[in-house]
């Protein structure tokens, strides 16, 4: 695709990546999806503030609230509330993630800013990287309340080491994001 201009905002402290797992009985394991109102409101507020400052037009929450009514429902409700109460000037939509994936690969231009919980954000960020050439050309950042880290996402590529194939573009674009952040 040419001209894809997406921003992906991912809550990355909760969800299934919280690491709350246990073995219920031999051969049966369980992971717990964690969602707190505080974290959901924090990322929604940050996303809308960021989109507004960058003069973006629309935020889309991709979710599975039709199935995960409590966790994804809370995430969606917090985003909807932040929109209604603080940023009604921005367009807002919610889309079931399955349909959102299909729409993304069919026509990514219909999206502007994507707001996702942790696992979905991990998967969708890779999908979107594929739309523009792969992980090697996509910048990344982890924005905290006190500290931020700007990085080329997904680490190293030892499989192409020494072959003169790697591109520093993701690192350079992440550096540009860092400089624009301050």
Summary of predicted features, one role per range:
Residues 1-38:
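Flexible glycine-/small-residue-enriched beta->alpha junction loops
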Residues 2-5, 13, 54-57, 87-90, ...:
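Short coil/turn connectors at secondary-structure junctions
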Residues 5-6, 13-14, 22, 45, ...:
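Non-catalytic beta/alpha edge segments that cap or flank active sites
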Residues 7-11, 62, 116-118:
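Short beta-strand segments
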Residues 18-22, 70-75, 104-107, 127-128:
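Short acidic, glycine/serine/threonine-rich loops at helix termini
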Residues 23-27, 75-82, 132-141, 145:
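A glycine- and small-aliphatic-rich helix-loop capping segment at beta-alpha/alpha-beta transitions
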Residues 25-98, 110-113:
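Glycine-rich phosphate/diphosphate-binding loop of Rossmann-like nucleotide-binding domains
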Residues 104-182:
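Glycine-rich phosphate/nucleotide-binding loop
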């Amino acid at each position: 695709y040419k001209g894809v201009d997406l921003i992906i905002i991912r809550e990355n402290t909760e969800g299934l990546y919280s690491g709350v797992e246990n073995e219920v009985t031999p051969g049966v394991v369980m992971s717990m999806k964690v969602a707190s109102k505080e974290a959901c409101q924090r990322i929604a507020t940050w996303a809308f503030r960021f989109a507004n400052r960058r003069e973006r037009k629309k935020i889309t929450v991709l979710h599975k609230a039709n199935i995960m009514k409590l966790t994804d429902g809370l995430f969606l409700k917090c985003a909807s509330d932040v929109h209604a109460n603080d940023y009604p000037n921005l367009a807002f939509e919610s889309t079931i993630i399955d349909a959102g994936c299909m729409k993304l690969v069919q026509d990514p231009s219909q999206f502007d800013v994507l707001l996702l919980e942790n696992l979905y954000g991990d998967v969708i960020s890779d999908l979107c990287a594929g739309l523009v050439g792969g992980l090697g050309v996509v910048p990344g950042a982890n924005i905290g309340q006190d500290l931020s880290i700007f990085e080329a996402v997904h680490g190293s590529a030892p499989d192409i080491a020494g072959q003169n194939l790697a591109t520093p573009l993701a690192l350079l674009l992440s550096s540009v994001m860092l400089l624009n952040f301050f």
